[in-house]
């Protein structure tokens, strides 16, 4: 039973690694994505679409909880993307 649980855990970690792309800066991410996360674990995440969580753009391009919004959208005071 322990072996099965360990195999499941390893499989889940491998899948998470495939889905997310680790990054150190914006330059590590492809177009339409930003580098966001904690100081120890940042991943390339897509820019926010209409109604999705966001962080306002900043000159340092440092984001912790999510990316800025896609073009033509703005990040509202409640951190949701909406029409500009």
Curated annotation (Swiss-Prot):
Presence of keyword Signal: yes
MF terms in GO: toxin activity
Origin: domain of life: Eukaryota
This protein's UniProt keywords: Disulfide bond, Secreted, Signal, Toxin
Disulfide bonds, paired cysteine numbers: 23-35, 29-44, 34-67, 54-75, 69-81
GO cellular component: extracellular region
Tissue: Expressed by the venom gland.
Residues of the signal peptide: 1-21
Subcellular location: Secreted
Homology family: Belongs to the AVIT (prokineticin) family.
Protein name in the entry: U8-theraphotoxin-Hhn1a
Organism listed in the record: Cyriopagopus hainanus
């Amino acid at each position: 039973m322990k072996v099965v649980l360990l195999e499941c855990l390893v499989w889940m970690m491998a899948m998470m690694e495939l889905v997310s792309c680790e990054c150190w800066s914006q330059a590590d991410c492809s177009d339409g994505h930003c580098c966001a996360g904690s100081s120890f674990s940042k991943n390339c995440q897509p820019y926010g679409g209409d109604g999705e969580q966001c962080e306002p753009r900043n000159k340092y391009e440092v984001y912790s909880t999510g990316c800025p919004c896609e073009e033509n959208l703005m990040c509202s005071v409640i951190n949701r993307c909406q029409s500009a």
